[in-house]
Amino acid sequence: MRCPKCSSEESKVVDSRQAEDAIRRRRVCESCGFRFTTFERIEEMPLLVIKKDDKREPFNREKIVRGLVRSAYKRPVSSEDIETTVANVERKIRQLDSNEVESDVIGEFVMQELAELDDITYIRFASVYRSFKDVSELEELLKNITKK
């Protein structure tokens, strides 16, 4: 690993620890003695989302966050709940073993998570995601929720 101070290629690891999504390594340059930190992460496949019009765009977790924040407005859903939900959805997507996923699949994963979190947030999200044509479709969703 190149030293950021003297650019020497000779350094040794003096400490390794697991960080959130990486391994944190403390290093010391063998030439100048400078100590520095590096992080080692797994390089994940870039995810592409296949939209309804068959266009592809990079996966953007912030879009899910924004949708959840809107759906959870004035509901007892914390930002931590939203972050956990998004992390669970992203984990499910990455477990699909493909670097392309249809937007419908993402929406269904979000719905599964919201069904466990908060009914009103679930209904709000579903009303936008499923684009209900009339009240009967919403009534059907409400019947399914009340059966829980």
Swiss-Prot record:
Residues 47-137 form the ATP-cone domain. Its cofactor is Zn(2+). Keywords: ATP-binding, DNA-binding, Metal-binding, Nucleotide-binding, Repressor, Transcription, Transcription regulation, Zinc, Zinc-finger. GO terms for biological process: negative regulation of DNA-templated transcription. It comes from the Bacteria. The keyword Cytoplasm does not apply. One of its GO terms (molecular function) is ATP binding. A zinc finger (unnamed) spans 3-32. Belongs to the NrdR family. NCBIfam families: transcriptional regulator NrdR. Negatively regulates transcription of bacterial ribonucleotide reductase nrd genes and operons by binding to NrdR-boxes. This is Transcriptional repressor NrdR. The lineage of its organism: Bacteria, Bacillati, Bacillota, Bacilli, Lactobacillales. The gene is nrdR.
